[in-house]
Amino acid sequence: MLKMSGWQRQSQNQSWNLRRECSRRKCIFIHHHT
């Protein structure tokens, strides 16, 4: 149970980082093409 919750937290953090990276890239992309 503890391991499962830890894995869930890690996966959630990973998806959050991915989303943040995507938005940052989008920002850079927009700034680069304006």
UniProtKB/Swiss-Prot annotation:
One of its GO terms (cellular component) is late endosome. The keyword Electron transport does not apply. Its main location: nucleus. Keywords: Cytoplasm, Nucleus. GO terms for biological process: artery development; calcium ion import; diaphragm contraction; endoplasmic reticulum unfolded protein response; ER overload response; gene expression; intrinsic apoptotic signaling pathway in response to endoplasmic reticulum stress; negative regulation of fat cell differentiation. GO terms for molecular function: DNA binding; DNA-binding transcription factor activity. It is found in: Nucleus; Cytoplasm. This is DDIT3 upstream open reading frame protein. It comes from Homo sapiens (Human). The lineage of its organism: Eukaryota, Metazoa, Chordata, Craniata, Vertebrata. The gene is DDIT3.
